[in-house]
């Protein structure tokens, strides 16, 4: 998967289409990502010692990686990603602008 933790992405499909956020976690086995502030769900939390009150909390649910696109840092537009070899290392680059994402 080409999307990594810390990438700024835009949702391109689903109920949160158009929203932007930062990837907080990548679930490689399921090909999903968790984006801050996107795909919020309500979880019914049982009371425990750490949370004595319990109740309903809002958390981010995973979203499929195909439903997000990386925001190109050079022009702030969504772009597809590619991989090329520079100085013997694989680096990601933006297909739209051709600029390297990983420094």
From Swiss-Prot:
<dbReference type="GO" id="GO:0006412">
    <property type="term" value="P:translation"/>
</dbReference>
<dbReference type="Pfam" id="PF00467">
    <property type="entry name" value="KOW"/>
</dbReference>
<dbReference type="InterPro" id="IPR003256">
    <property type="entry name" value="Ribosomal_uL24"/>
</dbReference>
<comment type="subunit">
    <text>Part of the 50S ribosomal subunit.</text>
</comment>
<dbReference type="InterPro" id="IPR014722">
    <property type="entry name" value="Rib_uL2_dom2"/>
</dbReference>
<keyword id="KW-0694">RNA-binding</keyword>
<dbReference type="GO" id="GO:0003735">
    <property type="term" value="F:structural constituent of ribosome"/>
</dbReference>
<comment type="similarity">
    <text>Belongs to the universal ribosomal protein uL24 family.</text>
</comment>
<dbReference type="GO" id="GO:0005840">
    <property type="term" value="C:ribosome"/>
</dbReference>
<comment type="function">
    <text>One of two assembly initiator proteins, it binds directly to the 5'-end of the 23S rRNA, where it nucleates assembly of the 50S subunit.</text>
</comment>
<keyword id="KW-0689">Ribosomal protein</keyword>
<dbReference type="InterPro" id="IPR005825">
    <property type="entry name" value="Ribosomal_uL24_CS"/>
</dbReference>
<keyword id="KW-0699">rRNA-binding</keyword>
<dbReference type="Pfam" id="PF17136">
    <property type="entry name" value="ribosomal_L24"/>
</dbReference>
<dbReference type="GO" id="GO:1990904">
    <property type="term" value="C:ribonucleoprotein complex"/>
</dbReference>
<protein>
    <recommendedName>
        <fullName>Large ribosomal subunit protein uL24</fullName>
    </recommendedName>
</protein>
<dbReference type="GO" id="GO:0019843">
    <property type="term" value="F:rRNA binding"/>
</dbReference>
<dbReference type="InterPro" id="IPR008991">
    <property type="entry name" value="Translation_prot_SH3-like_sf"/>
</dbReference>
<comment type="function">
    <text>One of the proteins that surrounds the polypeptide exit tunnel on the outside of the subunit.</text>
</comment>
<keyword id="KW-0687">Ribonucleoprotein</keyword>
<dbReference type="InterPro" id="IPR005824">
    <property type="entry name" value="KOW"/>
</dbReference>
<dbReference type="InterPro" id="IPR041988">
    <property type="entry name" value="Ribosomal_uL24_KOW"/>
</dbReference>
């Amino acid at each position: 998967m080409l999307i990594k933790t810390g990438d700024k992405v835009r949702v391109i499909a689903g109920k949160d289409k158009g929203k932007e956020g930062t990837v907080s976690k990548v679930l490689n086995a399921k090909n999903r990502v968790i984006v801050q502030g996107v795909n919020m769900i309500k979880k019914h939390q049982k009371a425990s010692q750490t949370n004595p009150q319990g109740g309903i909390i809002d958390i981010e649910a995973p979203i499929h990686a195909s439903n997000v696109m990386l925001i190109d840092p050079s022009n702030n537009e969504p772009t597809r990603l590619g991989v090329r070899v520079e100085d013997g290392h694989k680096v990601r680059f933006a297909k739209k602008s051709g600029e390297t994402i990983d420094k």
